Amino acid sequence: MVNPSPASFWTQANALLRKNLTYQRKHIWTNVRLILVPLFLCLILLAIQQVLDALMKGVSDMSNCGGNVTLPGGICPIPNPPSLPPMLQIPQHELRSVKTDFFSYKDLPDKLCRETGSCPVTILFTGDKLPLGKALSANIFSTSFVVNSSDLLPTLANNVLGSTEAAGEDNYEDPGIASDLPIYSIQPSCSANSTWPLSLGQIQTAVKCVQGLCLWRNNSVEVNDELFKGSWRGNPAGMPNEIVAAYDLMSTDRKNFNVTIWYNSTYNDEFATGQALKLVRVPRSINLISNAYLKFLKGPGTRILFEFLKEVPKEETKMNQDIASLLGPLFFTWVVLLLFPVILTSLVYEKQERLRIIMKMHGLGDGPYWMISYAYFLTISMLYVISLVGFGSAIGLKYFRRNDYSIQFVFYFIYSNLQISLAFLVSSIFSKVKTVTVIAYILVYGTGLLGSFLFQKMIETQSFPEEWILAMELYPGFSLYRGLYEFSQYASRGNGMKWQDLSDSGMGEVFCIMSVEWFLALIVAYYIDQVFTSGKHPFFFLVNLFKSPSSLPRRPTVQRLDSKRVFIDMDKHDVTQERESVQKLRNEGSTGHAILCDNLKKVYPGRDGNPPKMAVRGLYLSVSSGECFGMLGPNGAGKTSFISMMTGLLKPSSGTALVQGLDICKDMNKVYTSMGVCPQHDLLWETLTGREHLLFYGRLKNIKGSDLTQAVEESLKSVSLYDGGVGDKPAGNYSGGMKRRLSVAISLIGNPKVVYLDEPSTGLDPASRKNLWNVIKRAKQNTAIILTTHSMEEAEFLCDRLGIFVDGGLQCIGNSKELKSRYGGSYVFTMTTSSKHEEEVERLVESVSPNAKKIYHLAGTQKFELPKQEVRIAEVFRAVEKAKANFTVFAWGLADTTLEDVFIKVARTAQAFISLS
């Protein structure tokens, strides 16, 4: 027994879930291969790790270490690190600050000093008290270079030393201390050729005197301006004018020491220099201003002696680089993102092949579709990432083992949901699988490369604004990369990431960004799907709150009725009658007819300078339950546009239609629950059997249990797909005719109230066609059927009424006998003779029908239309027998008007009228 009530949300969800499980069972190895992709990729990492370990083993040979000298990469132990003198970072002589067009300060040296190499180095001062600034600046530099080789570092610390070379990555060695590089002693003034030899360990170098200038500026704004313009990027001339350091003494006095220090951070800027992070020579700047203040308070003999810089002793460095942590962000970004094209192409494939819309036409709501599809993709995604983490941990990758598994689970769970939501969002924009596949893989690999070569450098650059980092993380690919980068950093440090590290690592912000984007993307994707795919009003979520029940018929206004009268005189009598019948039914509020089309119109907008195209011109039509209405018409007449509006593929430009009392403009989702559709092209899953198709669509029609089994069996038998186990074979193995029969069976299962059949017997052999016609004829007992066809035989056999559609409008309507009687009031007389007897044939026809009209003439064969009112069939036979005695007649015939003749006549007449108009 078929359940007449529509399927509930959970019934629809159950139907789709069962269908998807069946479909995935047939693709089980595809899913297994997908889930095993992480294992394959982890094995590649393991192989690379083993090769790298073998290479590092040779490099790590401690026999190459001698004393405290380290190999490249710093693998040797250093039990006694060297003591290094502290120095200031000073610019090279051609980069030092001088007078320029964009620097108006008169106390700067002339730029000619750059040619002689005698430019001083400059330190700027500002603050609230000028006298204090003058006093402190006078105490900054020592007036001479004094050193005692027997007590080298303490005596060297009394001098202010500087280097033009940037500091190293650590203090085990200083690149500024080399035999070919001088060290500078900064003094208030220098005598000519002030150079001193200096021995630092095994390195023989020289100390050169360089003048140091301490200049006062009125406020910190001036200091900032001078520092900014001193960079080659900060002035229009592109000319460097570098300052050593700057001090803002602010409120410093004898009781308070409050100083801000400016220094050049570009020397350790990896993003700017393209080199590894380096130390900056800031400690000596702090020591200088501190000593100057102490001398101001206590006299010249008071100071804090800054003797040397020294690293802690270092053990041997094991050369066992963890490749997973090194390549992790880039590699695992690609691994996780590989799911995005899989999900996206799956969604777009259903859209491209119109599988989703055919499911919707048979009653599948948007809610169940979204829920089941989302749950499936989430399940696959979680199995995929669990496989990734599990296999990575099993083969010993520290990247996974050291980081807290619960943090990893939450991270991958949130991103998987975000990725699925984005796939739904992007799928609403595209309709071609090939296009979206190319775009998806470009995004996958582009995201990884940009993350590695751009975004990671920004993260590691301390001076890069945090706000810009957060802004870039709004792109989901970069938020994924940031999370994976933090995992790799914590894993390489040895401890791994714990929950208490979220605020320190930036993972907390990543979690928040991804969570918010997950929900926003899901909401926007659903909104776009409802507006652009389902055709709802942009404010449908507000309209639903205030709309009145749409099932109540609307009574036309007086203005609306008057506007219709303009067209009545232009229509044929039968079309006018149909219009009046529909208007009467609407005025009376009748809901007895299964289908009522009320002034239904569809206009396609003009393109490329062409005018708008009127596809359906104000159609009025009523179809009652138990009736099969056939639509005939030439190609381009508007039949497909009409069916598309009735099935929800297109929105009417104006007018409406009621199906079972429900307005297709407002209640299409409810209409779908009582509708069956056989589209012009078979929309089937190639790997599902005919039985599985019918089980799925039967469940959507709320058929359950034994009723479902019985309905499926009867459907298979009725369309001859039962015998020989045909119904249990994949639909991809069916012939075109078998697929057509299955599509018809799908449209009829569950006894829908309304069925649309678009050329249902296309591609069938005569026997199968007759059988299918009988199936449709039996099914229409309690169903309203609208059928489009080009077969006149099919139309006569199945249809209770016919309508001929030309240029978007009904030209006539009625049953086949009425149409033939109305438009075919003549016989067709055909005779074939030799060409020399053609005139005699014409005289014969004129003798039996003076008003006959020749309609065909070719090589001795002629056809004539004979008006029925002036022709007696017996006279025609006698005339032909008499003619046979005079000349040879090869063939002749007399036929009544066929439906095809009517169709051709009506179509030609209508098109001729339209052309004249």
From Swiss-Prot:
Q: Give the GO cellular component terms, alphabetically.
A: membrane
Q: Which residues form the signal peptide?
A: none
Query: Keyword annotations for this protein?
Result: ATP-binding, Membrane, Nucleotide-binding, Transmembrane, Transmembrane helix, Transport
Q: Which SUPFAM superfamilies match?
A: P-loop containing nucleoside triphosphate hydrolases
Q: Which organism is it from?
A: Arabidopsis thaliana
Q: Does the keyword Membrane apply?
A: yes
Major localisation: membrane
Q: Which Pfam families does this UniProt record tie to the protein?
A: ABC2_membrane_3, ABC_tran, ABCA12_C
Query: SMART domains attached here?
Result: AAA
Q: Which family does it belong to?
A: Belongs to the ABC transporter superfamily. ABCA family. CPR flippase (TC 3.A.1.211) subfamily.
Listed transmembrane segments = 34-54, 323-343, 377-397, 409-429, 435-455, 508-528
Q: Report what the protein is called.
A: ABC transporter A family member 12
Binding-site positions, ATP: 633-640
The chain positions of domain ABC transporter read: 595-832
The record gives the membrane topology as: Multi-pass membrane protein
Where is this protein localized, as stated in its record? Membrane
- In terms of superkingdom, the source organism counts as Eukaryota
What GO molecular-function term can you cite, just one?
Answer: ABC-type transporter activity
Query: InterPro entries, per this entry?
Result: AAA+_ATPase, ABC2_TM, ABC_transporter-like_ATP-bd, ABC_transporter-like_CS, ABCA, P-loop_NTPase
